[in-house]
């Protein structure tokens, strides 16, 4: 059992191309932190890669909310980080600790998409601005929260999609988030594979539908 103030919870499903790199970055930049990988039924060898490099490996049914809730149950850190497998912090444990306020209950980092095209810088900037204004973080901004508060709220709930919005809305009632100036770098693969315009339209449509009350189970079919 690792004695640490920070625990990273990483849900995975067929992330063999990313999980090894992400865990290596965490080991280098957050050497005193705990890494928990929760696999939702991968068939590409993700589990074998993760087992070698993480502190705790768990298996559950597929679904980010389900996976992250399970990982949080096993976490020992006072602060939980929820990190996507294709996203890495572009800063060190010491840099984060220096910025983290003792009074902070939750927060998130600035997003930087990995692509070199100007459009990815624009998209990153818009996502960051939206999150700063609404206090609603996207999952790839590495949401962090005090474990005691996360537990008291009941975690991510039992959602098949939009779990990041759900948690943010619960947390912002309690406290404003600390928006870090530190960046996390997230893969632009979805944007590259599906096209920028199509991806933007899909994501904004899904978010708008969720805010209007459409069930996450229904929205999942279009994701």
Which residue ranges define each predicted feature?
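Acidic helix N-cap motif at the loop->helix transition within catalytic regions
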Residues: 17-21, 44-52
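Conserved donor NDP-sugar-binding/catalytic core segment of glycosyltransferases
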Residues: 91-119
